[in-house]
């Protein structure tokens, strides 16, 4: 087992990474203050792991709330089901909420923990690659609004993150690829040697090689933990973690939440960010193509939806958390391995990026 630390002073917490950790309650018990525990899961994950986790926490009074699965349910109505379960069971301020599932479950359970009786303890047990390398670390919680993704939420850090890598053995290949989008992101924004490693090992990752997966998760979490420790509330460097997300969130919102998986939209959105970086002369076309090839090898889309117009993108991108005083800030690559957040770009370059021929770019060879 590997243990990393998110350094936030008195609110610091560990990230445990390894095989079979669901069967090691001693990793969770020190982070549960009261006797009440509420496990939040979904209809896909609960049949696989809920009974096992409940059994390992036998010394506590445990309830579970099983939600419908999917991004389409990341809303107020589903959030209320969590509160209904907590209140019906008379859970008090010393309860601990455990998120058992992917990014949607983690975001909603964390938001519920932030809100319930003005804040209760919270534990993340992510079961998808995307949630293990990204959303479970850093304290971003929330729900979607029909007009914009993740526009309602709170920063609320967990007590501990428990990553059992064997949970990926039951993950569908499409979900695994979606998680790889966030892994690749770390190589692009802050760790070019890791990007090279990913190019050499992406096939092992897709084949669920445990050694390769564990290494990729550790390296991704270490990068995320370092950024969060330096900028918890995204006032500076943390925003670079959103490479591809402004374009990607526009895709998710326009197409309908859940039609494109988050990682799929991030992949296509990152290709758009690479294209814009190349048009600005910050990276070469060969470096742009390097990123495109890796996304393709990871089984991810690199072409945005053809039914989305430039106007569609601009409409959705105007409702983005990085918009400040009406100026759209974008995360772009100054060079491979170095991302910047900027609103200093010619409008015509953004328009050209939105109108680029991504189908032609997707045909590149080599």
Curated annotation (Swiss-Prot):
Belongs to the sugar phosphate cyclases superfamily. Dehydroquinate synthase family. InterPro entries: Dehydroquinate_synthase, DHQ_synth_AroB, DHQ_synth_fam, DHQS/DOIS_N, DHQS_C. This is 3-dehydroquinate synthase. It comes from the Bacteria. The gene is aroB. One of its GO terms (molecular function) is nucleotide binding. GO terms for biological process: amino acid biosynthetic process; aromatic amino acid family biosynthetic process; chorismate biosynthetic process. Its cofactor is Co(2+); Zn(2+); NAD(+). NAD(+) binds at residues 69-74, 103-107, 127-128, 140, 149. Pathway: Metabolic intermediate biosynthesis; chorismate biosynthesis; chorismate from D-erythrose 4-phosphate and phosphoenolpyruvate: step 2/7. It catalyses: 7-phospho-2-dehydro-3-deoxy-D-arabino-heptonate = 3-dehydroquinate + phosphate. Binds 1 divalent metal cation per subunit. Can use either Co(2+) or Zn(2+). PANTHER family: 3-DEHYDROQUINATE SYNTHASE (PTHR43622), 3-DEHYDROQUINATE SYNTHASE, CHLOROPLASTIC (PTHR43622:SF7). It holds the Pfam family DHQ_synthase. Keywords: Amino-acid biosynthesis, Aromatic amino acid biosynthesis, Cobalt, Cytoplasm, Lyase, Metal-binding, NAD, Nucleotide-binding, Zinc. Zn(2+) binds at residues 182, 245, 262. Catalyzes the conversion of 3-deoxy-D-arabino-heptulosonate 7-phosphate (DAHP) to dehydroquinate (DHQ). It is an enzyme of class 4 (lyase). GO terms for cellular component: cytoplasm. It is found in: Cytoplasm. Its EC number is 4.2.3.4. It comes from Pseudomonas fluorescens (strain ATCC BAA-477 / NRRL B-23932 / Pf-5).
């Amino acid at each position: 087992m590997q243990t990393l630390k998110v350094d936030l002073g008195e609110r610091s917490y560990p990230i445990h990474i390894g095989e079979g950790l669901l069967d090691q309650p001693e990793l969770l018990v020190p982070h549960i203050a009261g006797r009440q525990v509420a496990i939040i899961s979904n209809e896909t994950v609960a049949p696989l792991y809920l009974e096992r986790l409940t059994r390992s926490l036998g010394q506590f009074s445990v309830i579970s709330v099983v939600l419908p699965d999917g991004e389409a349910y990341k809303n107020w109505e589903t959030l209320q089901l969590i509160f209904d379960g907590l209140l019906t069971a008379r859970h008090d301020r010393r309860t601990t909420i455990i998120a058992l599932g992917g990014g949607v479950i983690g975001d909603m359970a964390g938001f519920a923990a932030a809100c319930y009786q003005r804040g209760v303890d919270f534990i993340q047990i992510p079961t998808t690659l995307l949630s293990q390398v990204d959303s479970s670390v850093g304290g971003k919680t929330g729900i979607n609004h029909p007009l914009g993704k993740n526009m309602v939420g709170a920063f609320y850090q967990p007590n501990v993150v428990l990553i059992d890598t064997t949970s990926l053995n039951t993950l569908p290949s499409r979900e695994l690829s979606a998680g790889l989008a966030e892994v690749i992101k770390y190589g692009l924004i802050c760790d070019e040697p890791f990007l090279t490693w990913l190019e050499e090992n992406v096939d092992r990752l897709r084949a669920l090689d445990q050694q390769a997966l564990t290494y990729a998760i550790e390296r991704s979490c270490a990068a995320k933990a370092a950024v969060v420790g330096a900028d918890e509330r995204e006032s500076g460097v943390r925003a670079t973690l959103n490479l591809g997300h402004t374009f990607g969130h526009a895709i998710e919102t326009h197409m309908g939440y859940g039609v494109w998986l988050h990682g799929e939209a991030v992949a296509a959105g990152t290709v758009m960010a690479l294209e814009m970086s190349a048009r600005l002369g910050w990276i070469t076309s060969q470096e742009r193509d390097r990123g495109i090839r890796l996304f393709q090898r990871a089984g991810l889309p690199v072409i945005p939806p053809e039914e989305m117009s430039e106007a569609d993108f601009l409409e959705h991108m105007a409702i983005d958390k990085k918009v400040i005083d009406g100026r759209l800030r974008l995360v772009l690559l100054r060079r491979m391995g170095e991302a910047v957040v900027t609103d200093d770009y010619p409008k015509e370059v953004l328009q050209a990026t939105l109108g680029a021929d991504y189908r032609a770019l997707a045909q590149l060879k080599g």
